[in-house]
């Protein structure tokens, strides 16, 4: 009882010390991960996203680094705000989109990104539009267009990553429809 009476006034200080130690451990874990995965603090810019030797954080292997960017963050002469990625199946398109999304999310959390250099634009929202499970149907196309219309009509800064949307309708038609909507929204 006497020991409890002596230690009672220290309870609040002990709780604060444990809380601070947990926070230090959190930041040390982040630093250890960032060092191990060769991450850098990104430069925060007004618009776009650009990674030099960016790497996907969740592949579980040493990925091939990629240099890619969009918008004003990209290297000079390659600053378009809209890009259409094409290529063979298993060519890395989805992995690239995921890599850009991861970098954007990490940067907006104030964390380092797995890249040699990075410039990340300020965005209010990140939208990932991907093919829903199942086959192509008018309902899937209609639902995607309704979602996309809501996204592009919102004037806040955003990053939109769309993956395999052409699979929801005839080959090529979905990509043309969606690209047309994005270009109209950009105008």
PLM features: what roles do these ranges have?
Residues 96-98, 102:
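Post-Walker A alpha-helix
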Residues 132-152:
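Short glycine-rich substrate-engagement loop in P-loop NTPases that contacts/grips substrate
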Residues 1-84, 119:
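Alpha-helical coupling/stalk and coiled-coil linker elements that connect catalytic or binding modules
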Residues 92-94:
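Conserved lysine of the Walker
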Residues 162-165:
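Walker B catalytic acidic pair
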Residues 85, 89:
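Hydrophobic anchor at the beta1->P-loop junction of P-loop NTPases
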Residues 102-116:
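Post-Walker A helix-loop "phosphate-sensing" segment adjacent to the P-loop in P-loop NTPases
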Residues 179-187:
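Substrate-engagement module of ASCE P-loop NTPases
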């Amino acid at each position: 009882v006497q020991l409890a009476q002596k230690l009672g006034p220290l309870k609040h200080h002990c709780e604060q010390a444990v809380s601070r130690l947990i926070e230090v451990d959190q930041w040390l874990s982040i630093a250890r991960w960032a060092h191990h995965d060769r991450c850098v603090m990104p430069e925060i810019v007004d618009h776009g996203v650009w990674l030099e030797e960016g790497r996907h954080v969740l592949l579980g292997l040493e990925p091939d680094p990629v240099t890619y960017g969009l918008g004003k963050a990209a290297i000079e002469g390659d600053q378009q705000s809209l890009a259409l990625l094409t290529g063979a199946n298993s060519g890395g398109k989805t992995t690239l989109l995921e890599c850009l999304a991861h970098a954007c999310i990490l940067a907006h959390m104030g964390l380092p990104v797995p890249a040699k250099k990075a410039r990340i634009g300020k965005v209010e929202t990140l939208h990932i539009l991907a093919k829903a499970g199942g086959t192509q149907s008018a309902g899937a196309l209609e639902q995607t267009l309704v979602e996309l219309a809501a996204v592009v009509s919102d004037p806040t800064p955003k990053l939109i990553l769309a993956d395999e949307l052409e699979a929801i309708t005839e080959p090529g038609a979905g990509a043309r429809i969606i690209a047309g909507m994005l270009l109209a929204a950009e105008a």
